[in-house]
Swiss-Prot record:
Entry cofactors: Zn(2+)
Positions bound to an alcohol: 50, 70
Species assigned in the record: Solanum tuberosum (Potato)
Protein name: Alcohol dehydrogenase 1
Enzyme type, top EC level: oxidoreductase
Swiss-Prot/TrEMBL keywords: Cytoplasm, Metal-binding, NAD, Oxidoreductase, Zinc
Catalytic activity: a primary alcohol + NAD(+) = an aldehyde + NADH + H(+); a secondary alcohol + NAD(+) = a ketone + NADH + H(+)
Keyword Oxidoreductase: yes
Main location: cytoplasm
SUPFAM superfamilies hit by this protein: GroES-like (SSF50129), NAD(P)-binding Rossmann-fold domains (SSF51735)
Underlying gene: ADH1
Length: 380
């Protein structure tokens, strides 16, 4: 590895040249890391709905050509000036949001929304100098959420890199750098269900099932899965879900159905769909006096949350969360340890594996709604 330090590395990357078109495998030049940056060799990456959303570019600013990808694991190849806590050979997870450790958010025990490195989906360059580290024939290829893991090598700000246990299998723990931690933390860190409590999970995709896994780990006795797709129910049992509600089966609002099932409402709910009606239902289905609802899904930009103020005055709590309230550098290593201690099971989230050359198949699988996480192996 050391022979490449300070040099431009030419490697393979899957480039999104335009919205909705298949990614193209290209030879890209990856510049050395600058001040407070790290160059990583990506070994495994997985596909998340966020990658597909920005590849389709239907509802936001299109930034192309771009190297997508943000859920991954790899090894540090080299570090830039000022980087002291990471070195070549370290095993790491790059994360789409960061932790500078200096701002008010990073110094707060309550927040993980770093002022410097908070996710910015429009920015396609490094914050240090406003330039891209990727190029083809001298022309820049843009970054994605500071990670761009659909490349054999990438450059990331040090604050967006979590150093993890070198014994952790990178082909499993790579899924912890985004969706699984988001759902898990929403339950464990924000909803905080107690042993024996009831929890409703709205949306049984990968993030929702991770939220259910959090409820299972916390010792919840009833985990009610809510989804319009009945085919997801069987799989959800593996994640601790005990009961299922399909809103299509009822003529009344799902919050009323859940209230009747649970003698007045669940103790906690976690909403993972981003649909505004589900968000309102998730809040209104929690028990008065102590119920807590946590919103995880990202709504449409025109969405408006409407509920009667009495629902709040009757001592229900509504919370939002970002990345499960985990600080990337400080907290994600301990989530990896949950897996290493067999407290958290990751294998059941991984339903497909593909070589890097077949990355477009991973997009097809997600667009068809097949499986949960597809691991893409970077090395042949």
């Amino acid at each position: 590895m050391s022979t490449t330090v300070g040099q431009v590395i030419r490697c393979k990357a899957a480039v999104a040249w335009e919205a909705g078109k298949p990614l193209v495998m290209e030879e890209v030049d990856v510049a050395p890391p600058q001040k407070m940056e790290v160059r990583l060799k990506i070994l495994y990456t997985s596909l998340c709905h966020t990658d597909v959303y920005f590849w389709e570019a239907k509802g936001q600013n299109p930034v192309f050509p771009r190297i997508l990808g943000h859920e991954a694991a790899g090894i540090v190849e080299s570090v830039g000036e000022g980087v002291t806590e990471l070195g070549p050979g370290d095993h790491v997870l790059p994360v789409f949001t960061g932790e500078c450790k200096d701002c008010a958010h990073c110094k707060s025990e309550e927040s993980n929304m770093c002022s410097l490195l908070r996710i910015n989906t429009d920015r396609g360059v490094m914050i240090n100098d406003g330039q891209s580290r990727f190029s083809i024939n001298g022309k820049p290829i843009y970054h994605f959420v500071g990670t761009s893991t659909f490349s054999e090598y990438t450059v990331v700000h040090v604050g967006c890199v979590a150093k993890i246990n070198p014994l952790a299998p990178l082909d499993k723990v790579c899924v912890l750098s985004c969706g699984i931690s988001t759902g898990l933390g929403a339950t464990l860190n924000v909803a905080k269900p107690t042993k024996g409590s009831s929890v409703a999970i709205f949306g049984l995709g990968a993030v929702g099932l991770a939220a259910a896994e959090g409820a299972r780990i916390a010792g919840a006795s009833r985990i009610i899965g809510v989804d319009l797709n009945a085919s997801r129910f069987e799989q959800a049992k593996k994640f601790g879900v005990t009961e299922f509600v399909n809103p299509k089966d009822y003529s009344k609002p799902v919050q009323e159905v859940i209230a009747e099932m649970t003698d007045g409402g669940v103790d906690r709910s976690v909403e993972c769909t981003g649909h505004i009606d589900a968000m309102i239902s998730a809040f209104e289905c929690v028990h008065d006096g102590w119920g807590v609802a946590v919103l995880v899904g990202v709504p449409h930009k025109e969405a408006v949350f409407k509920t009667h103020p009495m629902n709040l005055l009757n001592e229900r709590t509504l919370k939002g969360t970002f990345f499960g309230n985990y600080k990337p550098r400080s907290d994600i290593p301990s989530v990896v340890e949950k897996y290493m201690n067999k407290e958290l099971e990751l294998e059941k989230f991984i339903t497909h594996t593909l070589p890097f050359a077949e990355i477009n198949k991973a997009f097809d699988l997600m667009l068809k709604g097949e499986g949960l996480r597809c691991i893409i192996t970077m090395e042949d």
